[in-house]
Amino acid sequence: PNEPLRVNVLFKHVQKMLTGDSAVIAETGDSWFNCQKLKLPEGCGYEFQMQYGSIGWSVGALLGYPQGANHKRVIAFIGDGSFQVTAQDVSTILRCEQNSIIFLINNGGYTIEVEIHDGPYNVIKNWNYTGFVDAIHNGLGKCWTSKVKSEEDLTAAIETALGEKDCLCFIEVIAHKDDTSKELLEWGSRVSAANSRPPNPQ
């Protein structure tokens, strides 16, 4: 009991959350590969972008999606590095009183960038992410945050988010920095090899 939470266990529980009234937003990074394994119920929305590899896009997308489809409860999966790029949009999400669920996967760095080309620039300052959202909330309106470190924590947080909270639910998932999907490892090595090619003479 209370063993460290693995990302594949997170997505096992996420699968059970999905209904035709849900929508999934997958941030650039390992969330791409984990969300692609989900089996979407009929009617469940799904948004991701891979063409440009733009990190941080999902927070703005999470703001926009419910504005156009307010019958869906949107569930977003965002890495800590990506979140730091566009985190301020949470303020507008709160002002618009949206009831989305954010799973913030805190593994202490830009995992996708590490797999492509490692270096000290991929180390980020760790935030207290739940504290950050609580500060933006500032006691005005409705918001609920939780920090989870084990499967037991996770199941309790999901039960609360789905059962009691018709507001923004922000669940910070503490994950090990090396807890990475094999798909990301394979993809990162291919991109790294492509980036290492000599220039094509014109």
UniProtKB/Swiss-Prot annotation:
Keyword Oxidoreductase: no
Needed co-factor(s): a metal cation; thiamine diphosphate
Cofactor binding note from Swiss-Prot or TrEMBL: Binds 1 metal ion per subunit. Binds 1 thiamine pyrophosphate per subunit.
Residues reported in the UniProt entry to bind substrate: E113
Molecular function terms, GO-annotated: metal ion binding; pyruvate decarboxylase activity; thiamine pyrophosphate binding
Keywords: Decarboxylase, Lyase, Magnesium, Metal-binding, Stress response, Thiamine pyrophosphate
Positions bound to Mg(2+): D80, N107, G109
Protein's UniProt keywords contain Cell cycle: no
InterPro entries: PDC/IPDC-like (IPR012110), THDP-binding (IPR029061), TPP_enzyme_TPP-bd (IPR011766), TPP_PDC_IPDC (IPR047214)
Factors inducing expression: By hypoxic stress.
Enzyme Commission number: 4.1.1.1
Domain of life: Eukaryota
Reaction catalysed by this enzyme: a 2-oxocarboxylate + H(+) = an aldehyde + CO2
Enzyme class (EC, first level): lyase
Region annotation (Thiamine pyrophosphate binding) ranges: 30-112
Coiled-coil annotated spans: none
UniProt xrefs under PANTHER family: PYRUVATE DECARBOXYLASE, PYRUVATE DECARBOXYLASE 2
The family this protein is said to belong to: Belongs to the TPP enzyme family.
Assembly description: Homotetramer.
Annotated protein name in UniProt: Pyruvate decarboxylase 3
Organism: Zea mays (Maize)
Source species taxonomy: Eukaryota, Viridiplantae, Streptophyta, Embryophyta, Tracheophyta
UniProt gene name: PDC3
